[in-house]
Amino acid sequence: MAQGDSWFSTAAAQAHGNLLQELMFKQPAAALNCAGRGESLSHVVDLEAAPEFVRLLGDTSAPAWDGILLSVGGNDVIAAAQTPAHLPDGSEVPLEKRLLRRQTEWGPPSAGVGRYFSEPGWTTLADYLRTNLRHLISLRDQGPSAGKPMFVHCYAVPMPRPAAAEDGRGPWLYPMLKAYAVPSADWLAVSRLMVMHLAQLLKSLAADKEQFPHLHVFDSTSVPLATATPGSSGVSGDWHNEIHLNHSGSFKIARAWSEAIENVLVGPPPKPVKAGKGR
């Protein structure tokens, strides 16, 4: 069974690339995709707001799935990065509730691109993601799929650029980095910093076998992708728009993830036996 954000959605707006559809295994396999064709999940907390998914995950009458595939966390990071420094009434948004710092809050240049980043805001977001993923684990373990592997992927590093989706959404990072006056030369590095923070968090959760049993995280940041050209507004590199992959990008990540999933479900392929020397 699968559930998640736009990287799993089969909506027409995502026809350019769907990570789930690019998965390929040696044995026949099928997944019930709860992300469906309509609005995919915007935030990880919305998973529980999808009653059919919750029923299929944890109800005693649900099937026992071989595994659960999740695409979660990316939109939460994007939303946190989009949080402005001030509300419409002029009041300041505290650092604990946003990921970017105003120019007067920047650290010293010696801090690198980390000087633009709100660590207090990241702590808030990490606690939120940790709590909700732990809740998903508990839902799984209430039903017939208790102890079955739950597979989560990390994301890839997008180039902040003026590339919106066909349905008018976006761009996502580009306007906020401009609003926070982050130098354009540092945009990609700031994007990488946020994606890597999420990847490190997800991997740390998977390493906590007591609180997050049978959680398997695939580090998609290690898959080489063609970065979009700075300033481009359309398809570029392995990207369809600012934050969504095209078919080639989805293909590259999905093929590597397929192997990682298969290694858990059926075990790694046997190592070749070295031929002995003849007498």
Question: Which role fits each region the language model picked out?
Answer:
Residues 162-217, 250:
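Substrate-gating cap/lid alpha-helix
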Residues 1-38:
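Serine-esterase "nucleophile elbow" of acetyl-processing enzymes
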Residues 46-68, 132-147, 207:
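Short amphipathic alpha-helices and their capping/turn segments at secondary-structure boundaries
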Residues 51-124, 156-166:
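Oxyanion-hole/transition-state-stabilizing segment in secreted/luminal serine hydrolases
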Residues 9-12, 41-42, 76-80, 158-164, ...:
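Short catalytic/ligand-binding loop motif for oxyanion handling, primarily in non-cytosolic enzymes
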